[in-house]
Design a protein with these regions (language model features):
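Intrinsically disordered, low-complexity regulatory segments of kinases
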Residues: 1-181
């Protein structure tokens, strides 16, 4: 953080100039998954950043690849003979978590719906209330996307979203279902 200031009741924070988002890099690379060693390093940094937030009683609530930026998105280009195309490999996987516009302190009002749909935890979809674990769910979805190159839960419908979760993870716990009634 370089500086911060208040602008008509809005806290503004200035940071260093960053590179592309991890999503934009993935998209520009034809959704070619990141190599596992890069996934591991990016996942570690995201977990460390979120741990810092949670230790300070703050939930990000909108973690997604678009809100994770490379410090520098320079890349090396190589030609894949098998796929007959150029592929990019980011030179440095140093990242920063950004966009704290919907971040919420533990003691503040928690709106019913948070997170971008594809990274939304089941307790948010079921409107059971949420806290810091919703960030952890989002991290899991992000790591999957980095590793395979596509979104785990590609949907825009609550019921379909929950059905997709059940297909992958098994039935939603009955204690959660009971609380929705």
């Amino acid at each position: 953080m370089f500086d911060w200031f208040d602008y008509h009741g809005h806290m503004c924070i200035s940071f260093e100039l960053l590179g592309l988002s991890t999503f934009d890099f993935l998209k520009d690379n034809n959704y070619l998954p990141y190599p596992i060693h890069q996934v591991r390093h990016m996942a570690y940094q995201v977990c460390q950043a979120v741990k810092f937030l949670h230790d300070n009683k703050l939930t990000h609530t909108d973690l997604k690849p678009e809100n994770i930026l490379f410090v520098n998105s320079d890349y090396e280009l190589s030609y894949n003979l098998e796929k007959k195309r150029d592929e990019r490999s980011v030179k440095s996987t140093a990242i920063r978590v950004v966009d704290f516009g919907s971040a919420t302190f533990d003691h503040e009002h928690h709106s019913t719906i948070v997170s971008t749909r594809h990274y939304r935890a089941p307790e948010v979809i079921l409107e059971l209330g949420w806290s810091q674990p919703c960030d952890v769910w989002s991290i899991g979805c992000i790591i999957f996307e980095y590793y395979v190159g596509f979104t785990l839960f590609q949907t825009h419908d609550n019921r379909e979203h929950l059905a997709m979760m059940e297909r992958i993870l098994g039935p939603i716990p009955s204690r959660m279902i009971r609380k929705t009634r």
